[in-house]
Amino acid sequence: MKLAHLSLFLLALHLSSSRSPSASDLPQEELVDQKCLLQKYTHRSCNKVFCQPWQRCIEGTCICKLPYQCPRAGTPVCAMNGRSYPTYCHQKSFECLHPEIKFSHNGTCAAEGKFNVSLIYGRTKTEGLVQVKLVDQDERMFICKNSWSMAEANVACVDLGFPLGVRDIQGSFNISGNLHINDTECLHVHCRGVETSLAECAFTKRRTELSNGLAGVVCYKQDADFPTSLSFQCVNGKHIPQEKACNGVNDCGDQSDELCCKGCRGNASLCKSGVCIPDQYKCNGEVDCITGEDESRCEEDRQQNIPKGLARSAQGEAEIETEETEMLTPGMDNERKRIKSLLPKLSCGVKRNTHTRRKRVIGGKPANVGDYPWQVAIKDGQRITCGGIYIGGCWILTAAHCVRPSRAHSYQVWTALLDWLKPNSQLGIQTVKRVIVHEKYNGATFQNDIALIEMKMHTGKKECELPNSVPACVPWSPYLFQPNDRCIISGWGRGKDNQKVYSLRWGEVDLIGNCSQFYPDRYYEKEMQCAGTRDGSIDACKGDSGGPLVCEDINNVTYVWGIVSWGENCGKPEFPGVYTRVANYFDWISYHVGRSLVSQHNV
C-alpha cells in the first residue's frame, strides 16, 4: 500500500515538472484550459490581469473606483457630456460608474465640435467602412486598412453601441462608385484595446504607399451566430472560431479567449499565469503578465539584438511606414501608464541584505541573520509553539490551530530569532494585542487554517517598530505560482527522527498540484497547497506550524504562498506537507489589516 502511495507521489511530481507546452506541442482543442474556463475569467478578473488605474480589485473582480480615489496630478479632459474632469483617471472612473459618459478629448470643453465615429456603405447598421470626425477637424475621414486590427475594431464597435465588439474586419461593403479617395488621405489609428471610445486612441495622418484600402468592420450582434462544435464561447456570450482562442488577440472583446491557455499560437507569448499576450507587449516598459516575466531579462535581450515591442504583429498591427506627417491626437495610453505610476507602491518581500544563494542541502540548513526576515516565532508561556509570518505594520500571519483569541495576553512574538537557546542581538520581543481566527476555521478538517495576530505598539509610538524584520508580500492571485515551482519552508520544528531543533532551519520544496490522491476526502484544493520533495528529506514537521512556505517571483520578490498547516508522517515522501493557500484569503486578510498594507497592485 505504501509503495502505491509513493508511486502516486512521484507521478504527481513528474507531471508537475513537465515544461509548459508551446502551441505546436498541443492539438488545437487542448490549447485551452477547460478547468480554468469554468471560472469565467474576463478583462475584469484580477486573478488573471491587472486592473485599470481607475479600478480596484475586490474579491477577484476589478470594480470602479470613486473619482476621489484617483491621483490628483494630471491635466483636464473633456467628456462627451460637455463636462470637464480634473484628470483622465477621474473621467474614466466616472465613466466606469456611468458608461454613457465617454471620453471626448484632452483639455477643457472649450473646443468646438465633438468626436464622432460612424459606419458607411454597409448593408446593415452593424457594418461598413469606418469614418471619424476628430474634435476641431471640419471633415470626416476614413481609417487606413493597414493600421486596423482587432484592437481598434473592438473599440470602434463598443463606441458605436455594440458591447460585444467586432465580428469581422474583412467585410464586403457596397462602396459607391462616386468614392474617389487617395489612400494617403486616410488616418492611421492605434488603440491598446482597453479603450471604450476611438477618441482615446492615437490618430496620425501619414503619407504612405503601403496602404491597401480602407478599414471596415462588422460589429457583433447578440443573435449573430449559433454555437458549433468548432466555436469558442466567450464569457460575454459571443462565439468566435475555436482557432482564434489563445492567439494573443482579444477576439472576444472581454479577453476571455486569452485567459485560460496552456500554450499560445501565432505571435503571442504565454504568461506563467496561463494568459496569452501579444509578442509586442514583451519588454515594452509595462508589466502585462501578473507574474512579471514579460519585463524580465529585457536588457539581456537588447544586448543580443532581439527587437521586442518595436513592430506590431501580423494580426492587423501597423506596418513600418516610410514617411510620417502630423500627429492629430496622441491617444491616452501614455496617460494611462502615467496614472499607474502614480498609484501607491508597497515595499515587501525584498531582503535588506543579499546572501549568496546556497545549493540545496538534504535535510535543510541553519539560517543566517537576514535570510528570512519575515519569519517570527510565537511563544506561549515558556515554549515556542509555532511559527508565523510578518506581513507589515503590526500584523503576523499564522495558522488558526496555533492560537486562541482568549489567550492573546499570553503570547509573545519573537522577531529575527535564529536560535532560541542562544538569543541573538537582533532579537525583538513583541506583546500581542489581539488574535483573529478565521470565522470558518474547522479544527477537525483544518479548513480555513489561518489566523492573524496584531502586536501591541510600544508606548508613545504610532506604529510597530521591527527594525530587523521585512514583511513578506501577500499574494492576491492563485496563479502567481504553479505546480513544480521551487519554494522555501523555514522553522524550528522537529528534525530527523523527531529530534528537537533549536536553530531556525530552511529547506527547498516543490509545489505539488491536487493532493486528493494522497489525502482522499481531506484535501480541499481551493484552500490548501501541497509541497514536498521526491525523497521526503525536506518537510515541515511538528513545531513548524504557522510558519511560512514562501516563493520568489521572477524579480526575486518573496510571497507567503502557504502557512504550515498539517500532514502525516513527517519526512515520508508519500505524505507531502499541506499548507494553507494564502492567496485564497487575500480579501479576508486585507479586510482586517487594511488594503493599503498588503495590496501591491490594483489599489
Swiss-Prot record:
UniProt binding sites for Ca(2+) 1: K244, N247, V249, D251, D257, E258
UniProt-listed Gene3D superfamilies: 3.30.60.30, Low-density Lipoprotein Receptor, SRCR-like domain, Trypsin-like serine proteases
UniProt-listed InterPro entries: CFAI_FIMAC_N, CFAI_KAZAL, FacI_MAC, Kazal_dom, Kazal_dom_sf, LDL_receptor-like_sf, LDLR_class-A_CS, LDrepeatLR_classA_rpt
Compartment(s) where it occurs, according to its Swiss-Prot or TrEMBL record: Secreted, Extracellular space
Active site, renumbered: H401, D449, S545
Reaction(s) catalysed (UniProt annotation): Inactivates complement subcomponents C3b, iC3b and C4b by proteolytic cleavage
GO biological process, one term: proteolysis
Tissue: Expressed in the liver by hepatocytes. Also present in other cells such as monocytes, fibroblasts or keratinocytes.
Pfam families given in the database record: CFAI_FIMAC_N, Kazal_CFAI, Ldl_recept_a, SRCR, Trypsin
Recorded superkingdom: Eukaryota
Residues that hold Ca(2+) 2 according to the record: Y281, N284, E286, D288, D294, E295
Signal peptide positions (record): 1-18
E.C. number(s) listed in UniProt: 3.4.21.45
Domain SRCR: 117-217
PROSITE patterns: KAZAL_2 (PS51465), LDLRA_1 (PS01209), LDLRA_2 (PS50068), SRCR_2 (PS50287), TRYPSIN_DOM (PS50240), TRYPSIN_HIS (PS00134), TRYPSIN_SER (PS00135)
Domain spans labelled Peptidase S1: 361-594
GO cellular component, one term: extracellular space
Keyword annotations from UniProtKB, A to Z: Calcium, Cleavage on pair of basic residues, Complement pathway, Disulfide bond, Glycoprotein, Hydrolase, Immunity, Innate immunity, Metal-binding, Protease, Repeat, Secreted, Serine protease, Signal
Knocked-out gene: effects: CFI-deficient mice are viable and fertile under specific pathogen-free conditions. In the absence of factor I/CFI, physiological cleavage of the alpha-chain of C3b is prevented, and reduced plasma C3, factor B, and factor H levels are observed.
Record domain Kazal-like: where: 58-111
Subunit relationships: Heterodimer of a light and heavy chains; disulfide-linked. The fully processed and mature protein circulates as a zymogen, and is allosterically activated by substrate-induced remodeling of the active site. Interacts with C3b. Interacts with complement factor H.
Function: Trypsin-like serine protease that plays an essential role in regulating the immune response by controlling all complement pathways. Inhibits these pathways by cleaving three peptide bonds in the alpha-chain of C3b and two bonds in the alpha-chain of C4b thereby inactivating these proteins. Essential cofactors for these reactions include factor H and C4BP in the fluid phase and membrane cofactor protein/CD46 and CR1 on cell surfaces.
Sequence similarity: Belongs to the peptidase S1 family.
Stated name of the protein: Complement factor I
